[in-house]
Amino acid sequence: MNGLGREQCESTAPVFYSATVVVREMDSPSLDLRPFKIMQFPFTPKLVTQIREGYSAAYFRKDALAGLTVAIVALPLSMAIAIASHAPPQAGLFTAIIGGFLVSALGGSRFQIGGPAGAFIVLVASIIDAHGMAGLMLATMMAGVIMVVGALLRLGSLVRHVPHAVTVGFTAGIAVIIFASQIHDLFGLTLAAPEPGDLVHKLKALWQASPTANPWAIALAACTIAIIVAIRTWRPLWPSLLIAVVLASTAAWALQLPVETIGTRFGGIPSMLPFPSLPSFEGQSLLALLPSAISLAVLGSIESLLSAVVADGMTGRLHRSNAELVAQGVANILTPLFGGITVTGTIARTATNVKAGAHGPISGMMHALYVLLFMLLAAPLMSLIPLAALAGILALVAWNMVEKKEILKLVHWGPLLVLAVTFLVTIFRDLIEGIAAGIVLSLLLNWLAPRRQS
């Protein structure tokens, strides 16, 4: 059985999280290393599966390059999400490093990239405003425990029953949200006030700021997209994202272009990772934080598992839902100890990982190590990257996330209606509400179908 076939069989079986323990049989005084018994414990990470299948230097080169590409995107994005969430920028970096490493090392998806997510901005900001950073850390750790319990109850497998139209609509909605979040940097706009979170007010504010558009930023973003598309067309084996970022950064630095960079937007990058410590939870009420913890757990579980489903669709692989849920839970329990915020699998960075040619979870682990390395050694160089170039990359990622072929396959009005409702509720209301609306509508249509026929 080849690697893909084995992975599919393991994914559909009722697997548990498993570390593999090797027990040597010693039935005689002589030492015999040949007979081994493999004992499986629940929830095998995909990292273990990959190692069993064999891991070559060629695979490592693919993962190292993909991890570097994702890290280049994740570094400013993690800081920006943290700032928008009312947390210090280094909290986003710590989340990408610790949470990203744990999600990839322990997760049930080969390609999942963990870190801070834009979907959590409003929820995380409201928790920090009400309970402070200590309250967020406690709520995040509680959410992690809830995720692990959910995995033990096999709730992660429920994502397999989410209708395909809901997944396609949700993914398209996320793509629109991601693209909208990049318009500011794509056009080099200067906003008079902080950028609103909801789509309608965001687009209104961006339109009002349109006279401030920076032609140099627009040119850099357009050139970045053009370089990536050209390389993927004529030299598909070349690292298109990395080359585009290096060329854009070099041009902006050499020509002294008046565009925002990581350095001008975010200031200095932290140069060390804090020692893990338990923050003071004095005055924090577990009962008061429980609703927030449940919301974090539900949203994190849904986004992570749907992100894994998206990666499955892009690669033909199958993830292990409950193993992924355990990894997300462990990451959310441990990341706050390093000063991080809530962790989840992120569709944009996961899609970037796949598009960059990742082979397996080591790319996600490398992405975390690269972010740490940049934080320790390469802060001055990283500060030169134009935000317009990164916005161009994410705009292209958002475009590629929309499953256009899958949308065209939905020829019946029922699935199309489910897709449209999921998409619209996701972009105009809330991610969880979008998924819930799509599932409820799908169930309703399935319930009404036999009655219409009779």
List the predicted regions and their residue ranges.
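Ala/Thr-enriched low-complexity intrinsically disordered regions
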Residues: 12-13, 19-20
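Juxtamembrane/membrane-water interface recognition
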Residues: 20-22, 84
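Transmembrane helical cores of multi-pass ion-transport proteins
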Residues: 31-454
